[in-house]
Curated annotation (Swiss-Prot):
Keywords, sorted A to Z: Amino-acid biosynthesis, ATP-binding, Cytoplasm, Kinase, Nucleotide-binding, Threonine biosynthesis, Transferase
Primary role: Catalyzes the ATP-dependent phosphorylation of L-homoserine to L-homoserine phosphate.
Protein name as it appears in the record: Homoserine kinase
Pfam families to which the protein is assigned, alphabetical: GHMP_kinases_C (PF08544), GHMP_kinases_N (PF00288)
Family: Belongs to the GHMP kinase family. Homoserine kinase subfamily.
Signal peptide positions (record): none
Localization per record: Cytoplasm
Main enzyme class: transferase
Keyword match Cell inner membrane: no
Organism of derivation: Chlorobium phaeovibrioides (strain DSM 265 / 1930)
Reaction equation(s) it catalyzes: L-homoserine + ATP = O-phospho-L-homoserine + ADP + H(+)
Length: 320
C-alpha cells in the first residue's frame, strides 16, 4: 500500500468586483487529504472514505456525494479513459477539515484541491495542475450546485486567477504583488453559499455593469503593476456586496474598521460571512484584522471570530 498526503489552502472568491471570475489563495489555513492505495481487487466504488475529522459530522461519507472523493472518482475516470492508465485497486480517503464550513473561505474547493493533488501524485502525475482544475470545478457543483471556478482554480494553482471564459475554460494566472497581504476574518456564524447566491439579482443595470467592469480591469492592472493604491480603489462591488452585506451582522462597521486601520480595501470573502482586507504590509494587515475582529465583537450579535494574516499563496495545492 502507498499513502500520499495533499494540502490546499483557503481561497477568497469574487475579490469584491470579480464576481465568479476572480479569486486568490492564501497560505493558511487549509484542508488535508490522505489517500491510501491498495492493489487488492475491490467490488463497488473504487474510492471509499475512511474518516472525516473537523466537520462536526456534517459532511457525507458517500463517496459520490462528498466533494473530496467525488473529484477523485472523476480524476480516475479521466485518466483511465483519456490517458489509458490502469486504475485497478482501491483508494481509501481520509479528510482532515481545518476550514470552517459555509464560511466564504473556499472550504469545499480546498478539500477537492487537496484530494486531487494527492491523487495525481499517487498515480504518477498523469495530469497537469491546469487539468486538475476541471475536476475541482465539478466538485463545486456537488458542494453548492454551481460549477464556479473562483475558489477551485486558485486552490489548485495558487496566486490570483482570472476566469476569462467558462466554455471553454480559459484561466489566467496573475502573480501577486510582493508586499500584498490579506487579512481574513471569519465570524462564528454560517452563511450557506446557496442562500447567499439566491439573494443576488438576475439582471443589473448598464450603469452598474460599467462600474463593475471598470473596477475589475483596474484591479487586474493594479495587481500586474504593483500599484497598491489602485488595488485598494478597485475593491468596489456594486453587484453582490449590496445584497449580501445585510446577511452579515456588523458588515459595514467591520469594513469601516479595516479601512480606518489602514487597509487598502475590504469586502466580503466569497459569499460570506468571512470578510477580507488587503494591506501593503504585514503590520498593517495585522492591525486591520484585529480591528475587524473588534468590530464583529461590538456588533449586535457580539460575534467572536478567527483571524488569519497571510501573503498570497503562489504554490497552490501541494504534497506534504
Amino acid at each position: 500500500m502507498k499513502s500520499v498526503r495533499g494540502f490546499a489552502s483557503a481561497t477568497v472568491g469574487n475579490v469584491a468586483c470579480g464576481f465568479d471570475i476572480l479569486g486568490f489563495a492564501i497560505t493558511e489555513p487549509g484542508d488535508e487529504v490522505i489517500l491510501t492505495r491498495s492493489e487488492r481487487k475491490h467490488t463497488g466504488c473504487p474510492v471509499t472514505i475512511s474518516s472525516i475529522s473537523g466537520d462536526g459530522g456534517k459532511l457525507p461519507l458517500d463517496p459520490r456525494k462528498n466533494t473530496s472523493s467525488f473529484v477523485v472518482l472523476k480524476f480516475l475516470e479521466h485518466i483511465r479513459t483519456h490517458k489509458g492508465q490502469d486504475c485497478t485497486g482501491h483508494i481509501s480517503l481520509e479528510l482532515k477539515k481545518h476550514l470552517p464550513l459555509s464560511s466564504g473561505m473556499g472550504s469545499s474547493a480546498a478539500s477537492a484541491a487537496a484530494a486531487l493533488a494527492a491523487a495525481n501524485e499517487l498515480l504518477g502525475r498523469p495530469c497537469t495542475k491546469m487539468e486538475l482544475v476541471h475536476f475541482a470545478i465539478e466538485g463545486e457543483r456537488v458542494a453548492c450546485g454551481s460549477a464556479h471556478a473562483d475558489n477551485a482554480a486558485p486552490a489548485i494553482l495558487g496566486n490570483f486567477v482570472l476566469i476569462r471564459s467558462y466554455t471553454p475554460l480559459d484561466l489566467i494566472v496573475i502573480p501577486p504583488p510582493e508586499k500584498l497581504f490579506c487579512s481574513l476574518v471569519h465570524p462564528h456564524t454560517e452563511l450557506r453559499t446557496s442562500f447567499a447566491r439566491s439573494v443576488l439579482p438576475t439582471d443589473i443595470t448598464l450603469k452598474d455593469a460599467t462600474r463593475q467592469w471598470g473596477n475589475v480591469g483596474a484591479l487586474v492592472a493594479g495587481l500586474l503593476t504593483s500599484d497598491y493604491a489602485l488595488v485598494g480603489r478597485s475593491l468596489v462591488d456594486v453587484v453582490a456586496e449590496p445584497k449580501r452585506a445585510p446577511l452579515i451582522p456588523g458588515f459595514a462597521e467591520v469594513k469601516e474598521a479595516a479601512l480606518n486601520a489602514g487597509a487598502l480595501g475590504c469586502s466580503i470573502a466569497g459569499s460570506g460571512p468571512s470578510i477580507f482586507a488587503f494591506s501593503d504590509s504585514a503590520e498593517t494587515a495585522h492591525a486591520a484584522g484585529e480591528a475587524m475582529q473588534k468590530a464583529f465583537l461590538a456588533s449586535k450579535k457580539s460575534l467572536k471570530s478567527d483571524m488569519w494574516v497571510s501573503p498570497i499563496c503562489r504554490e497552490g495545492a501541494r504534497i506534504l
